[in-house]
A protein has these predicted regions:
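Protease zymogen maturation seam
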Residues: 2-46, 60-61
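Second-shell loop/turn segments in exported
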Residues: 38, 75-81, 120-126, 158-166, ...
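Loop/turn elements at helix/coil->beta-strand transitions in domains of secreted/extracellular proteins
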Residues: 45-49, 103-107, 141-147, 177-182, ...
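Extracellular S/T/G-rich loop segment that most often corresponds to the catalytic His/Ser-adjacent loop
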Residues: 53, 202-284
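Solvent-exposed loop/turn segments at secondary-structure junctions
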Residues: 54-58, 71-72, 113-117, 152-157, ...
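C-terminal subdomain of the subtilisin-like protease fold in secreted/lumenal serine endopeptidases
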Residues: 148, 286-348
Length: 348
C-alpha cells in the first residue's frame, strides 16, 4: 500500500524524509467560511477517528492526538513519526483546531506505511494488505468510530483475482458490524494505477470511497473512477499542518534536482479526510448511526454532478430515522493457497 497523494508518487532516497514547505501565518488563505457554521451543529467531540497512514506528527493544532501502533518499524515504534509528510496533513484536514472539519475529534495515529522511511516488519510486510487489515483491527480495538484510509493498493486485472482479499475483507466486515465507518481515498490515476484496476479498499462495498475535485468543482483528472457510489471533496490542501512539529506548510520542498520547488499536497488522500471529518460530526450528533446510515446521509447530502460532499448539508439533515439505506452484502473469502502476495499500498 502507498499513500494516495498525487504529490507523493515520487521516488525519494531511502531514509530521506519529506521537508514541509513552511508558510507564514500572514500568508495563509482565509479559512472556509462554512467551518464556523458547521461548529454550531457539532465539533466532533467524543468521536475517535483512526488515521491509517504514514504516522501523524504532533502539532499544536492537533489537540487530541492519541498514539496508536507503528507497523512500519515495530522494533522502534513511533506512531508520531511522519517521514512522508502525509499522515499529518490528513489528520489536520480532519481535526486541525483552526481549519479542521471536526476540530474536537480525537485522532488515533496508526503508522502503516512509508514510501521514504520504510523499515520492513518481521515478515517484510509493512505497508501490505495484511498490515492494512491489522491496522483496521487495531483501530476497532481502540474504539474508533471512523477509520480514514488514505493509502490504497492498486491491482491490475491480471493480479486482482489472485490476491488474497480474505484478511482485509474480514477486517472491513468487523468494522461494519461494530459500527465503524471506513472512508478511503479513491486513488490517483498513474502508470501503475489505471482505470480498470481494482483499488483496495476503496472498491469494497462497505467502504465510503472519496474522489478528488478541482477548484471548479469538477472531478479531478487524476481521481480514479469508482465502480459504485462515491462522493468527492477538494483534493488540494493549501494550508496543511507541517510534519516537523509546528506551523503550516503548502507542500513538500526539496525534490531531487529542484530544491526550490514545492510539491503541493494534492490528491484523493486529502479529499478523504474531509469526508471523515463530516462523518465525525454526524456521529457526535447521532451516536447510534450505523455505518450504512452514515453512508446514506453523506450520499444524500452530496451535490449532483460531481457528488461533492457538503458537510453543512450533511450535518444539518433530518434525524437518521428518516434514512433507509440499503445494506451492502459482504462476503468473506477464505485464504487460497494460490493467492498472490499482498501488493504494497501507495500514497494517493
Amino acid at each position: 500500500t502507498a499513500p494516495a497523494s498525487h504529490a507523493q508518487n515520487l521516488p525519494a532516497a531511502e531514509g530521506t524524509c519529506a521537508l514541509p514547505a513552511h508558510v507564514a501565518d500572514t500568508e495563509l488563505p482565509a479559512p472556509d467560511p462554512q467551518l464556523a457554521q458547521l461548529l454550531r451543529f457539532a465539533t466532533g467531540a467524543g468521536v475517535r477517528v483512526a488515521v491509517i497512514d504514514t504516522g501523524v506528527a504532533p502539532n499544536p493544532q492537533l489537540r487530541r492526538l492519541i498514539p496508536g501502533v507503528d507497523l512500519v518499524d515495530p522494533e522502534s515504534p513511533d506512531p508520531f513519526f511522519d517521514c512522508d509528510s502525509h499522515g499529518t496533513v490528513v489528520a489536520g484536514v480532519i481535526a486541525g483546531a483552526s481549519r479542521g472539519v471536526a476540530p474536537d475529534a480525537e485522532i488515533l495515529s496508526i503508522r502503516q506505511t512509508s514510501m521514504r522511511a520504510r523499515q520492513p516488519g518481521p515478515q517484510g510486510d509493512a505497508g501490505s494488505l495484511q498490515t492494512l487489515a491489522d491496522a483496521v483491527h487495531f483501530a476497532l480495538d481502540q474504539r474508533a468510530r471512523v477509520i480514514n484510509v488514505s493509502v490504497v493498493s492498486c491491482l491490475p486485472p491480471r493480479l486482482a483475482g489472485r490476491v488474497d482479499m480474505g484478511p482485509i475483507r474480514a477486517a472491513l466486515a468487523r468494522a461494519e458490524a461494530e459500527g465503524a465507518l471506513v472512508v478511503s481515498a479513491a486513488g490517483n490515476a498513474s502508470e501503475s494505477c489505471e482505470p480498470g484496476y481494482t483499488v483496495v479498499p476503496a472498491h469494497e462495498p462497505t467502504v465510503l470511497a472519496v474522489g478528488a475535485r478541482d477548484g471548479d468543482h469538477s472531478i479531478a483528472a487524476y481521481s480514479m473512477p469508482v465502480p459504485g457510489p462515491f462522493v468527492s471533496a477538494p483534493g488540494l490542501v493549501e494550508a496543511a499542518l507541517a510534519s516537523d512539529g509546528s506551523g503550516w506548510a503548502s507542500g513538500t520542498a526539496g525534490r531531487p534536482g529542484r530544491k526550490d520547488a514545492v510539491q503541493p499536497y494534492l490528491g484523493t488522500s486529502f479529499a478523504a479526510p474531509a469526508v471523515s471529518g463530516a462523518a465525525a460530526l454526524l456521529i457526535q450528533r447521532y451516536p447510534h448511526l450505523s455505518p450504512a446510515q452514515l453512508r446514506a446521509l453523506i450520499h444524500a447530502a452530496a451535490q449532483p454532478g460531481g457528488a461533492a460532499v457538503d458537510p453543512l448539508a450533511a450535518v444539518a439533515q433530518l434525524p437518521p430515522a428518516t434514512v433507509a439505506p440499503r445494506q451492502p452484502a459482504v462476503t468473506i473469502e477464505p485464504a487460497r493457497e494460490s493467492a498472490a502476495p499482498a501488493r504494497w499500498l501507495r500514497l494517493v
